[in-house]
Amino acid sequence: MTFSMRDLDQALQGAGQKSGIEIWRIENFKPVTVPQESHGKFFTGDSYIVLKTTASRSGSLHHDIHYWLGKDSSQDEAGAVAVMTVELDSALGGRAVQYREVQGHETEKFLSYFKPCIIPQEGGVASGFNHVKPEEHQTRLYICKGKHVVRVKEVPFVRSTLNHEDVFILDTESKIFQFSGSKSSIQERAKALEVVQYIKDTYHDGKCDIAAVEDGRMMADAEAGEFWGLFGGFAPLPKKPAVNDDETAASDGIKLFSVEKGQTDAVEAECLTKELLDTNKCYILDCGLELFVWKGRSTSIDQRKSATEAAEEFFRSSEPPKSNLVSVMEGYETVMFRSKFDSWPASSTIAEPQQGRGKVAALLQRQGVNVQGLVKTSSSSSKDEPKPYIDGTGNLQVWRINCEEKILLEAAEQSKFYSGDCYILQYSYPGEDREEHLVGTWFGKQSVEEDRASAISLANKMVESMKFVPAQARINEGKEPIQFFVIMQSFITFKGGVSDAFKKYIAENDIPDTTYEAEGVALFRVQGSGPENMQAIQIEAASAGLNSSHCYILHGDSTVFTWCGNLTSSEDQELMERMLDLIKPNEPTKAQKEGSESEQFWELLGGKSEYPSQKIKRDGESDPHLFSCTYTNESLKATEIFNFTQDDLMTEDIFILDCHTEVFVWVGQQVDPKKKPQALDIGENFLKHDFLLENLASETPIYIVTEGNEPPFFTRFFTWDSSKSGMHGDSFQRKLAILTNKGKPLLDKPKRRVPAYSSRSTVPDKSQPRSRSMTFSPDRARVRGRSPAFNALAANFEKLNIRNQSTPPPMVSPMVRKLYPKSHAPDLSKIAPKSAIAARTALFEKPTPTSQEPPTSPSSSEATNQAEAPKSTSETNEEEAMSSINEDSKEEEAEEESSLPTFPYERLKTDSEDPVSDVDLTRREAYLTSVEFKEKFEMTKNEFYKLPKWKQNKLKMSVNLF
């Protein structure tokens, strides 16, 4: 028997179709919708269904169903609401996770929906309680527990209730007191302050005083005296007796039971493996305090209901009492459930239909069949390339590691790495309101441990000398993040290495030296999404390394070949031409097309053999997960924080943001100085433990980010307010300051000076001839047998570019302006005459020499500048010109936004039958009218653009605008 949405109670029909929270209260065994303004209000005599719908980065919807049982609700109602959740899950496709939530023992995920807390009120529908607020305020005492989410419970208003370990809130008619036990943590005190604010706003209409009382303050403190006076005077608090909390109660081990016709039978096995679970059955997994129900995909809805009812009975009769009951469907098991098994296979990914078509298309095209339209080309897939969230016009310096020293590379060699070596890069670039810095280490696959250790040590010293301002990155060959490629722009990886440690290692182990030689045989695979992100990777010179979806460069002693797979696009081939200009400039080439190769080509590759056709793709970025970490004696404990915000980042702690393709380690300002240097170890341990069982590779990029210096590619995961990290004190002191100072920070953090970046700059190298690798133009001479049509394509692909890299050209066309909205060329005719002359003069000024050593810190740089002689007239004029240009650029940007044409939604959506032409396809929403925008997104444009980019993209996906 199948169960569809129309079989549900009318109140539940249509649920779970968009992101958000939906709540139903059970009245007379029927669900009744709870209005949004009442979300978070629960009554002890009632039961509720809470549905959380989340849109993933892929655009699919994920559902979590919780049924909450008040302490005074009946068992019959609990059973009825449990069955309703099974029906709702079936109607939603049978993929939801179901949670049984008991008042006082709610899961952290459930509590995270209703931050800062829930405070259930007495009464309910069955008791006839009318939910009317009492006329007189009643003094109440609450205990607060939790560092990340707060569990609030009303306790007797007597002095003996207080203790040294916990945080308490005393709510009186005119003032709210927070009492912090001397042994309570700073994080618990800070979180309790959020509850104080909630009580003030909810029960006092925001009109009452707040007082913080610390354990140990005597009557001499006025607020402490007032607090103790409410308890009849001060008296020493007794020591809290040691008790076994539910969370620490011992279990008798994990037991598995099969459920048939409502009866449970133990499953005997030496160890738990997935093979014990039959897809035609349901099971109960007893884990002591936790209880799981597993439902096979082939089970009927009646079987699932029966298993749920059996689990409810199992739950009620257990000793000691259970805390949580979670139901999962086969194929959609939670991490917690899978972790209970000794053996659980990695999730097998189902091949996409597109990949299957790719193999067929390659085979047919080799036979001369036209396969246009059968597969998507790389130009369409390039749209899926993640955004870098980093400016590509900054200053770059690169050092190669040789034992314990670092050697600065010349500008022309900065993007050419050897697989047997290690490198350090320092990159400074303009941020939104300050100069941003990144110090990274790159480890080649063949590099030796000695060089890796030296690279980490030297990079740490660089970051320390800059007062820990830069973000720090650990990058491994083959797992480079998009930010790295945008910084390098045209990146080449050669086989072998040149460091002394590498040479010594291969000599001692009799390993052949395969280090790249310009005159030898070498094969390069070309990849990337555009001129700002392209790579040439040297691979084994064998035909098995070819791929129908890629372009290649092959050179021998005196011959250069290019090879284009049949599934490559014109953009792929253009990238190959660009990389060819870097690897073998000014040399004639022999173009080879798949299926019509010459014998000489195959001879260089050692003969012809089979090779794949599927495009080598990067792992996709997943939805971010935030973890709070403690690291003692090389043992890492990580606690996930659900539905996280910036406020969850506590200054005393270290957090990890896991995005699957990259991991961020965030270090708070108040973290113990002895633990700050362990940040990289914490990140590496996190990869090793793989807490989400997502098969994290040990080579996954790790970023170390310090509080107050978060780069844009980190803050994009939050709705970020930079002023919050500009406050003094610990988490408790900061939040208390916000409460008592009407939300104003104690101290505005000074902004770092933002230098003017007109183009990508590096250490100048006059000894090197100007490379022609990035100088395509309409007038470029034909080379390597290019046709006029190809040269025209090259001209359109590149445009004339003064920095020979990836930034937009100075004079931008309307289409280019859409692609590069932040890049503007100044129109000197619009600048005041004096400023225009200064700008022209500045072009002839000698460039300031670039230091080849990393700056010690922004503050020390400013101090040095102040000590220098007064600026020359030309320098002053240049600054005035730049200031004028920047102002004009801002005005131009504002005018551009306001002057965009508007189009109907039906013409802008991705599947439109009458699509609009000549619009920026990455910003379709910008062309909606204000009325239609608010109708589709349920918010204004200003509110929308304040959201993190990934959240904007999620919303755009949900309305077919991305």
Curated annotation (Swiss-Prot):
Compositionally biased tracts (Acidic residues): 889-898
Signal peptide span: none
Phenotype of null mutants: Retarded pollen tube growth, but no effect on pollen germination, root hair growth, organization or amount of filamentous actin in pollen grains or tubes. Increased sensitivity to latrunculin B (LatB) and instability of actin filaments in pollen tubes. Decreased severing frequency of actin filaments. Vln2 and vln5 double mutants have pollen tubes curled and wider at some regions along the tube. They accumulate actin filaments at the tips of pollen tubes.
Gelsolin-like-type repeats, residues: 29-79, 150-190, 262-305, 396-453, 534-574, 636-677
One GO term describing the cellular component: cytoplasm
Biased composition (Low complexity): 845-862
PROSITE patterns on file: HP
Record's subcellular location: Cytoplasm, Cytoskeleton
InterPro entries (UniProt xref): ADF-H/Gelsolin-like_dom_sf (IPR029006), Gelsolin-like_dom (IPR007123), Villin/Gelsolin (IPR007122), Villin_headpiece (IPR003128), Villin_headpiece_dom_sf (IPR036886)
BP-aspect Gene Ontology terms: actin filament capping; actin filament organization
HP domain location: 897-962
Residues with the Phosphoserine modification: S777, S787, S883
Tissue-specific expression: Ubiquitous, but expressed preferentially in pollen and stamens.
A Pfam family it matches: Gelsolin
Keywords noted in UniProt: Actin capping, Actin-binding, Calcium, Cytoplasm, Cytoskeleton, Phosphoprotein, Repeat
GO MF annotations in UniProt: actin filament binding
Domain of life: Eukaryota
Keyword check for Iron: no
Gene3D superfamilies found in the cross-reference section: Severin, Villin headpiece domain
Residues covered by region (Disordered): 749-785, 845-917
Family assignment from sequence similarity: Belongs to the villin/gelsolin family.
Summary of the function given for this chain in its UniProt record: Major actin filament stabilizing factor and regulator of actin dynamics. Binds actin and actin filament bundles in a Ca(2+)-insensitive manner, but caps the barbed end of actin filaments and is able to sever them in a calcium-dependent manner. Required for the construction of actin collars in pollen tubes. Acts synergistically with VLN2 (AC O81644) to regulate polarized pollen tube growth.
Name of this chain's protein: Villin-5
Organism name: Arabidopsis thaliana (Mouse-ear cress)
Gene (name only): VLN5
